[in-house]
Amino acid sequence: MTNAELLQEGINLMFAGVGFVMLFLFILIYAIEFMSKLVNTYFPEPVKAPSTKPIQAENHDLERLRPVIVAAIAHHRRQQGLK
């Protein structure tokens, strides 16, 4: 065989290999998509109900915490020698 024939045979084998790999990857992608749809039909994820009332801190809780926060800040400043 001449060098040109060997080069041509190598190129043919390269394209055949690339073609088979691409074909395998496409089949793999479609198989994974199919399995995902199949699993989701038999085992759907439960839908969580939205909470009807947003969580908010009530004003009386904040009013009760205000002196505690002020005392904690004053204690910290006394320890650090800031005041």
UniProtKB/Swiss-Prot annotation:
GO terms for biological process: sodium ion export across plasma membrane. It is a single-pass membrane protein. It holds the Pfam family OAD_gamma. One of its GO terms (molecular function) is sodium ion transmembrane transporter activity. It is found in: Cell membrane. It is an enzyme of class 7 (translocase). The chain crosses the membrane at residues 10-32. Its EC number is 7.2.4.2. It catalyses: oxaloacetate + 2 Na(+)(in) + H(+) = pyruvate + 2 Na(+)(out) + CO2. One of its GO terms (cellular component) is plasma membrane. InterPro entries: Na_pump_deCOase (IPR005899), OadG (IPR023424). Its cofactor is Na(+). Keywords: Cell membrane, Ion transport, Membrane, Sodium, Sodium transport, Translocase, Transmembrane, Transmembrane helix, Transport. Its main location: membrane. Belongs to the OadG family. Catalyzes the decarboxylation of oxaloacetate coupled to Na(+) translocation. HAMAP family: OadG. Heterotrimer of an alpha, a beta and a gamma subunit. This is Probable oxaloacetate decarboxylase gamma chain. It comes from Pasteurella multocida (strain Pm70). The gene is oadG.
